[in-house]
Amino acid sequence: GRNMDIISAKRLRELSGGGVRTPMGCRSFLQTWTDETGKEVNAGRMNLGVVTLNLPRIAIESNGDKELFWKTFEERVAVMKDALLYRVARSREAKPENAPILYMEGGWGRKLGVDEEVNELFKNKRATISMGYIGLYEVGTVFYGANWESDPEAKAFTLEILKRMKDYCDTWGNEYGYHFSVYGTPSESLTDRFCKMDKALFGSIP
């Protein structure tokens, strides 16, 4: 479903260049996209999925060593890239007849013929694919202790993590023709799962 966020409308206009977006589901927004005529298009677009980075695990494994943190970060991002491209490839394997309402009846903004490639709806950054993350606050806690929000160095470090993710997404988007986005994964169940997995590996960390 889509939910209108009245409170955020003013800020959404600033971020989008004038338009107001409604999120897909709870918290996922599509970027501004225009078709070949220059018309802005929102309806009928889609997200091809998300792969989520467990940031607290990288921070814990680095044991306070930022150089090791960034090295591990780069390694995990490389794995994420492969996983995201796999999601795109699997999506492209679909046939219009697999989901006629979406592909052939206009649910995704255009009516494809039975023999057309579904990638016609995805390419040129019409579709998004998301690099998700969980636990940015906990990364700050590992390196700077609790209540680090007012520490300029801590804030700069956490923002640098997001910036590097965004830089990767921009590079991949230009290389592959899909809109790679940075996405604060809104999944309470995955947060709980990651936490349980990390606790099993590292124990309780005060």
Please state what every model-predicted region is.
Residues 129-142, 163:
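Contiguous, well-ordered alpha-helical segments that form the cores/surfaces of helical PPI scaffolds
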Residues 1-125, 146-147, 151-206:
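Conserved catalytic cores of very large enzyme subunits
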